[in-house]
Regions:
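Alpha-helical bundle regulatory/interaction domains
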Residues: 1-33, 41-42, 46-52, 66, ...
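Short hydrophobic/aromatic patch on the recognition helix
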Residues: 55, 107-108, 112
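DNA major-groove recognition helix of helix-turn-helix
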Residues: 59, 71, 111-112, 124
Length: 129
């Protein structure tokens, strides 16, 4: 009756949310995935072989924040390190933004102000003083 039909069964690895959260942190932080401008919840879900909705649940339940807030915090922290680094003192704010994973300088500006209460330009000025 089923001749000619090919049945495929995909085996999914089952991980609990704590294990997924640990893998997520390693992938995003240690491997600097946040520096990819196109990095998204969907690309992370695909890499982990889970749904984007499950990624969101893991972030809320295990990490305590949203995917986007977590990634933007990593980007902002990285931008801060670059702004304070003598090696990057001649990089433009646009360069710093792109190296940190932001799509442009204004997005970095908004996130930086939200996280640190000062702008990237003010941070750079304070570092030079």
């Amino acid at each position: 009756m089923f001749r000619g039909y090919r049945i495929e069964i995909r085996v999914h690895k089952v991980y609990n949310h704590k294990e997924i959260a640990a893998r997520i942190k390693t992938m995003i932080c240690d491997n600097h995935l946040f520096r990819d401008i196109h990095f998204s919840r969907e690309t992370l879900a695909k890499e982990l072989e889970i749904s984007p909705a499950r990624v969101s649940i893991v972030f809320q339940e295990e990490i305590g924040t949203s995917f986007y807030d977590f990634v933007n915090r990593q980007r902002t922290d990285y931008a801060r390190r670059l702004l304070k680094s003598a090696v990057h003192k001649n990089d433009t704010l646009e360069d710093i933004a792109l190296q940190s994973g932001f799509s442009n300088r204004m997005t970095m500006h908004r996130m930086y102000l939200k996280v640190y209460g000062i702008t990237p330009g003010e941070e750079r000025k304070n570092t030079k003083e």
